[in-house]
């Protein structure tokens, strides 16, 4: 049935000379690794009420008086460490992914890239798809695990700027077999040259209060141990989705529970974030005698500051100070051929929802 639906949609698109638009969304990046550019980016990012979910006046004080006077200078130095000759890694790899997904999907589709913050904007991407005379729209935020601060914020922006009458959304793919298989293949490729003592799956963290707002039920979860398998009671819980992704990848790799762990990075501010924290987890692993560590970042399909600098440089340095021998960061999926095919398959599968 799915194949027939896809075939009918393609025939209709060709007949009417209308393409199917695919909008890939990523978080965003500064235009350059300078203090002014980073300040502009952070101002837009942190002013989003879904990112800092406090009353508007309190958010303004936090952003403009506590963060922007200090953080842009520090962050600009971090961006300078990972900046590529072609530009921001996140933008370079995202554009590469967009191009290759477009080539894979073929002439009946038009693929555009929009950033929630910074350039190219979601509005600009939607205009490109409209100019290409697309009549149907598939929206795919590149956030495997659903959260209000990433996926919901991006989709809110799409709905505010969208003029397409027919739209379908892939709002999460944390357990999508094509995504899990792509991650597993990527890890296997790196195991050819490095055999770790332990695997650490490090995800972007969130303030704990975000889980409560998403419907995570406190009564069944103390957020200290591994989350329970996905069910109706925690299907919208970001933390539970991260643990489920890890379980599925570990199962494909034939890992025991003692061979891998899950932690959360990139916390900001003084509020309580979901645990365990990646930097604290490294300390515990060193105490257990782990020497060779492989770190995988499944919540980042495209390499960015959080993978290349936070893990690839800072965590690497911390691990060496703790007495570890090697910390190997697995690259993000970026434009890996299997991942490109996975996105194409997810897009085609979503056509049956129109």
Swiss-Prot record:
Reaction equation(s) it catalyzes: heme b + 2 H(+) = protoporphyrin IX + Fe(2+)
Enzyme class: lyase
Matches recorded under Pfam families: Ferrochelatase
Associated pathway: Porphyrin-containing compound metabolism; protoheme biosynthesis; protoheme from protoporphyrin-IX: step 1/1
Source lineage: Bacteria, Pseudomonadati, Pseudomonadota, Gammaproteobacteria, Legionellales
Gene: hemH
Function comment: Catalyzes the ferrous insertion into protoporphyrin IX.
Source organism (scientific name): Coxiella burnetii (strain CbuK_Q154)
Residue stretches spanning the membrane: none
Keywords, in A-Z order: Cytoplasm, Heme biosynthesis, Iron, Lyase, Metal-binding, Porphyrin biosynthesis
Subcellular location: Cytoplasm
Protein name, UniProt field: Ferrochelatase
A single Gene Ontology CC term: cytoplasm
Cited InterPro entries: Ferrochelatase, Ferrochelatase_AS, Ferrochelatase_C, Ferrochelatase_N
């Amino acid at each position: 049935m799915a194949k027939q639906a896809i075939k009918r949609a393609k025939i209709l698109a060709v007949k009417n000379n209308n393409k199917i638009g695919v909008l890939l969304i990523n978080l965003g990046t500064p235009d350059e690794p300078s203090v002014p550019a980073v300040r502009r980016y952070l101002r837009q990012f942190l002013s989003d009420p879904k990112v800092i979910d406090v009353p508007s006046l309190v958010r303004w004080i936090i952003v403009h008086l506590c963060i922007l006077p200090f953080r842009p200078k520090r962050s600009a130095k971090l961006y300078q460490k990972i900046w590529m000759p072609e530009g921001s890694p996140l933008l370079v790899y995202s554009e590469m992914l967009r191009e290759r997904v477009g080539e894979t999907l073929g002439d009946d589709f038009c693929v555009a890239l929009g950033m929630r913050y910074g350039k190219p904007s979601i509005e600009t991407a939607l205009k490109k798809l409209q100019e290409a005379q697309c009549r149907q729209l598939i929206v795919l935020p590149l956030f495997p695990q659903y959260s209000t601060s990433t996926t919901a914020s991006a989709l809110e922006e799409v709905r505010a700027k969208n003029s397409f009458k027919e739209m379908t959304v892939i709002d999460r793919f944390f357990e999508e077999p094509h995504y899990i298989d792509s991650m597993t293949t990527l890890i296997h490729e790196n195991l050819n040259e490095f055999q770790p003592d332990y695997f650490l799956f490090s995800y972007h963290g969130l303030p704990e209060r975000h889980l409560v707002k998403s419907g995570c039920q406190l009564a069944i979860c103390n957020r200290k141990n591994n989350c329970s398998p996905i069910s109706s009671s925690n299907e919208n819980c970001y933390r539970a989705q991260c643990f489920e992704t890890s379980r599925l990848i570990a199962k494909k790799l034939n890992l025991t529970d003692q061979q891998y762990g899950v932690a959360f990075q990139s916390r900001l501010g003084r509020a309580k974030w979901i645990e365990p924290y990646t930097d604290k987890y490294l300390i515990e692993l060193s105490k257990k005698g782990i020497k060779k560590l492989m770190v995988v970042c499944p919540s980042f399909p495209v390499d960015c500051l959080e993978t290349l600098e936070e893990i690839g440089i800072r965590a690497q340095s911390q691990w060496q100070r703790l007495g570890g021998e090697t910390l190997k960061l697995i690259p993000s999926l970026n434009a890996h051929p299997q991942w490109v095919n996975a996105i194409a398959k997810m897009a085609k599968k979503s056509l049956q929802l129109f």
